[in-house]
């Protein structure tokens, strides 16, 4: 599986190259959950993504983040509702309002990148950006759920 440090490097490349926000996922253009989906295709071959059963469907990724039972055939392999006891880990997916029209996904990066303490990387209308979690939540409401994403090794 892809190490978290490799996942972070691919996300950082998107930010450095100033990828744009777009519902059509392609090189240089991704929507919010597209930052995860595109890194899976980038790291693994298309046939490997299929063999790993990594879904390319946005709604499926959102919905699996909030169901009581984790579906191992979906992208989120471990998850929960965010509360005061949630321990954020670098590379963890964060979900906001997964069932609403304004649902959103970001990746928690914490202090992985210099100059940030408690940050997320996300694709928003301004493109792929890193900003403090508190700033993202102040603009768009708090994230409600977290999940460990399929294809990523969180042990490193």
State where each predicted segment sits.
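Non-catalytic ligand/cofactor/substrate-binding and regulatory segments of enzyme domains
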Residues: 1-21, 122-156
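Intrinsically disordered, low-complexity N-terminal regions enriched in serine/proline/glycine
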Residues: 20, 35-42, 61, 66, ...
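...with weaker cross-activation on analogous glycine-rich loops/strands in unrelated enzymes
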Residues: 46-135, 141
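N-terminal capping segments
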Residues: 1-61
